[in-house]
Amino acid sequence: MTGNLKLFELKKLEDTRMKIVIINGSARKGNTLTAINAFIKGASEKNEIEIIEPDKLNIAPCRGCGVCQCSKGCVDKDDTNPTIDKIAAADMILFATPVYWWGMSAQLKLVIDKCYCRGLQLKNKKVGTIVVGGSPVDSIQYELIDKQFDCMAKYLSWDMLFNKSYYATARDEHEKNKYSMNELEGI
């Protein structure tokens, strides 16, 4: 496991009720969902939590048409605008993804791309990431994903509270790692 925690900021989270939106970038009910559930176990008592599951939504890829910059959201008649409304209303966003080809999943990237339609409404959020992959956590894949989120955080003035990376190759392997489960519950 790797990552940093802003302990002062996390202490402040304990004192404030927040609306947390979790974007589950995994289509499977495996190690990424296990990590999400551990986080929820620790955070749900004091916060309102909603999970967005992109694989269950009808969201078309961004066309890059730019119309959204002159109107109130994406022109696609799909689940984009209601999904982005939920993200924009959140105090904290948790991005969770398995590693696919040294990057985040297509499901998560699709939602992030569609956030372009209301990027300014996503400024100044508290953010965390959970990344689960099949290589040891000192592998370049986690660093690449963390750097991508760090760039987004800088651009949108996000307060990046934590980047957590976990190694799990077999289904349900993450659940057996008591240290990481306790760590996620403690965030």
Can you describe what each PLM-predicted range is?
Residues 122-163:
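Short, glycine-/small-residue-rich phosphate/pyrophosphate-handling segment
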Residues 2-96, 102-118, 154-169, 173-187:
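N-terminal beta1-alpha1-beta2 submodule of the flavodoxin-like/Rossmannoid cofactor-binding fold
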